[in-house]
Amino acid sequence: MGQRILGLDPGLAIVGFGALLCPDSRQGSLELLDFGVISTPAGAEIGDRLETIYQDLHQLIDLVQPDAVAVEKLFFYRMGNTIAVAQARGVLMLVLRQRRLPYCEFTPAQVKQALTGYGNAPKLAVQQAVQRELQLDAIPRPDDAADAVALALTAWFQQLA
C-alpha cells in the first residue's frame, strides 16, 4: 500500500504543502497526491492569519490522511521574517501534536543534500530533482509547494536509508 508523507514549508504568508504516496521500497513508484499552498492575507491581523493556517492545515490533514509529516527546520536570516515564520511553524507543530502525527524536520541544506547530493545546490536543482524523481511534466509551482514536495521526498529517502 505504501505510506503517505506530507511535506510542509512553513511561512506566515504562505505555507507550502506536498503529499506523496511512497512505496515500501525503491522498487515501487512514487505518486504525487497533492500539492499547493495555504495562504493568508497580508493585511490581516497576525492572530487571524495564524488561525487560517491552523484551520486549513486541519482540513488538509483530513483530506490527505498522512502517516508522517516532514517540516522545514527554521533557520535564521532576516530577524523580522524569522519571527513570523516561527509563529506559523508553531501553529503547524501544534496541529501535528493535536493530530498525533509523527514528524521529522530537515534544514534546507539537508533537503538539498538528499535530492542533489550537494548541500549548497541552487533551488532550481532541487526543483528539477523533484520533477525527475516524480516523473512530472513540470516543476510544481509555486516554489513553496515545490519545497514542501522536496521535504516529503527527503523524509522518504531517509526512511529507505
Curated annotation (Swiss-Prot):
Keywords from the UniProt entry: Cytoplasm, DNA damage, DNA recombination, DNA repair, DNA-binding, Endonuclease, Hydrolase, Magnesium, Metal-binding, Nuclease
Disulfide bonds: none
Note on cofactor: Binds 2 Mg(2+) ion per subunit.
Catalytic activity annotation: Endonucleolytic cleavage at a junction such as a reciprocal single-stranded crossover between two homologous DNA duplexes (Holliday junction)
Main location: cytoplasm
One BP term from GO: DNA recombination
One annotated Gene Ontology cellular component of this protein: cytoplasm
NCBIfam families per UniProt: PRK00039.2-1
Protein name: Crossover junction endodeoxyribonuclease RuvC
Protein's organism: Synechococcus elongatus (strain ATCC 33912 / PCC 7942 / FACHB-805)
Gene expressing this chain: ruvC
